[in-house]
Amino acid sequence: VCDFSVQAANGLVLVRGGGGRGKTSLMCVLAGELAADAGQLQVGGVWLYEQPEAYRQQVFWAETRSAAHDALTCGDYLAKVQRHYPAFDEARLHRAIEGLSLAPHLDKNIFMLSTGSKRKLYLAAAFSCGAALTLLDTPFAALDKVSIRFALSLLAEAEQNRDKLWVLADYAQP
């Protein structure tokens, strides 16, 4: 990604492009996991270069291909997310667990989940964490139709809620 600059208002933003076009790299930069060649990142008045931990505490990003949390159970992962984000909404979590049919998986280790169930887990965390900036990379891949409809309904709510920014990267508009 060269000569890229963005300032986004709260709501929902779609980053669309084909495979290998830099969508995931952009998400990693916005999450503070990949250094930009130039420029600065700020969320909620906190600059990444000045306060990296405070910045990351305002950003939700889960790389679904990562094995970083695989040894945790789903329930332990969600508890970890709850501890990390002060604005975590337990009621939204319960709604997401129900809407994404995650209850049967809460005691399973993440490495035991199918790709779709792992994605559902990270979506439940995203929808309930309360982060100022939530990054979703191809959130509908490997999901069943019921879960896609549920996730779209939560994204529609997020679009109307102007106190947070959601960035969705995908191949096409959902």
What kind of feature is each model-predicted range?
Residues 123:
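Hydrophobic anchor residue at the start of the ABC signature
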Residues 65, 70-86, 92:
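Q-loop/switch helix immediately C-terminal to the Walker
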Residues 109-118:
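Conserved ABC ATPase signature
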Residues 137, 143-144, 148:
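ABC-family nucleotide-binding domains
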Residues 39-50, 54-55:
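Conserved ABC transporter NBD signature motif
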Residues 31:
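Helix-to-loop junction immediately C-terminal to a conserved catalytic motif
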